[in-house]
Amino acid sequence: MKLSKSTLVFSALLVILAAASAAPANQFIKTSCTLTTYPAVCEQSLSAYAKTIQNNPQELASTALQVSLTRTQQAQTFMKRLNKFKGLKARQYAAIHDCLEEVEDSLDRVSRSCDEMKNLSHAKGNDFTFRMSNVETWVSAALTDETTCMDGFAGKGMDGKIKESVRAQVVAVARVTSNALALVNNFAAKHKH
């Protein structure tokens, strides 16, 4: 099948235009991510959504929360599988069970935050402030839940592959949640009276 020159030129123009429109959005994400604790993680986790985010701070914060939600769901799935693992020591089982509860609490808080962010488009004045305060509080509490998860794994008796696997999951979730909190706080600060 032979493509005409005009088809090739048109296709090339579409690719160039798509790249050009994504460039400002990617720059917006990169600049915004400098405000976070983990800028490289922030940029990497959000750049795929540049087309959706554009230069919209609310969309950026909402998308960061969605990334946190997805990552928390993945950690929950991992913890549930690990919780069913045969051959765990009683202390490992208890730590995994407690950690799973913390991850589930975190998941609930981030999910509620995502829902609240969706309702912001209609909120004004005190209603906006109240809703943003909810989001900030819930995301902060979710981050606390995530970091508390590792408490049960303290001590040398808990060292090993189980602890390291859980730690890797928790660190990944905590980083995207921390970044989401920073972006939410930045968005809220720009809209305070």
Swiss-Prot record:
GO terms for molecular function: enzyme inhibitor activity. Keywords: Signal. Coiled coil: none annotated. It comes from the Eukaryota. Gene3D superfamilies: Invertase/pectin methylesterase inhibitor family protein. Residues 1-22 form the signal peptide. Pfam families: PMEI. PANTHER family: PECTINESTERASE INHIBITOR 7, PECTINESTERASE INHIBITOR-LIKE. This is 21 kDa protein. The lineage of its organism: Eukaryota, Viridiplantae, Streptophyta, Embryophyta, Tracheophyta.
